[in-house]
Amino acid sequence: MQKQHQRQHKVELVANLKSQFADAKALLICDYKGLSVRKLEALRNKARNQGIKVQVIKNTLAHIAMKETGYSDLDLKETNVFLWGDDQIALSKLVFDFQKEHKDHFVLKAGLFDKESVSVAHVEAVSKLPSKEELMGMLLSVWTAPARYFVTGLDNLRKAKEEN
């Protein structure tokens, strides 16, 4: 009875992971060997505030969930923590900022963006991009610049005519 309950729990966990992995735009796998529980909880709290999920998953269960989701086959060995979410930039920034603070105990091992394997260097490059909100602000600034310059020009023309 106990083993049957454990098996059912594992099946439910894999189904849940499969669903969440399928919906995620980004998935990063990190080695957390030697990281204290307190520090891992701090990472979870930062991630939760950004809508990012963090979970330590048994490699065999993660492998099954990833395979059934269609993610490329990854070599899952040793201790792994999985981080996933919809914002690739926010997830990359979170991982690399945390990795800077905990160099010896937290290392990015693999990454998947839109179900495609990406290198650690690619994830690092993405982490250096402006956030989604900053990019939208830049774009809005570019869009409104012509109107701003036009209004400024009209105002300068009005002031010049008033002086004459």
Curated annotation (Swiss-Prot):
Listed GO CC annotations: large ribosomal subunit
InterPro entries in UniProt: Ribosomal_uL10, Ribosomal_uL10-like_sf, Ribosomal_uL10_bac, Ribosomal_uL10_bac_type, Ribosomal_uL10_CS_bac
Transmembrane residue ranges: none
PROSITE patterns membership: RIBOSOMAL_L10
Sorted UniProt keywords: Ribonucleoprotein, Ribosomal protein, RNA-binding, rRNA-binding
Gene Ontology BP terms: translation
GO MF assignments: large ribosomal subunit rRNA binding; structural constituent of ribosome
Matches recorded under CDD domains: Ribosomal_L10 (cd05797)
Keyword Oxidoreductase: no
Top-level division of the source organism's lineage: Bacteria
PANTHER family, alphabetized: 39S RIBOSOMAL PROTEIN L10, MITOCHONDRIAL
Described purpose of this protein according to its UniProt entry: Forms part of the ribosomal stalk, playing a central role in the interaction of the ribosome with GTP-bound translation factors.
Assembly: Part of the ribosomal stalk of the 50S ribosomal subunit. The N-terminus interacts with L11 and the large rRNA to form the base of the stalk. The C-terminus forms an elongated spine to which L12 dimers bind in a sequential fashion forming a multimeric L10(L12)X complex.
Family: Belongs to the universal ribosomal protein uL10 family.
The protein's name in its UniProt record: Large ribosomal subunit protein uL10
Source species taxonomy: Bacteria, Pseudomonadati, Campylobacterota, Epsilonproteobacteria, Campylobacterales
Gene it is expressed from: rplJ
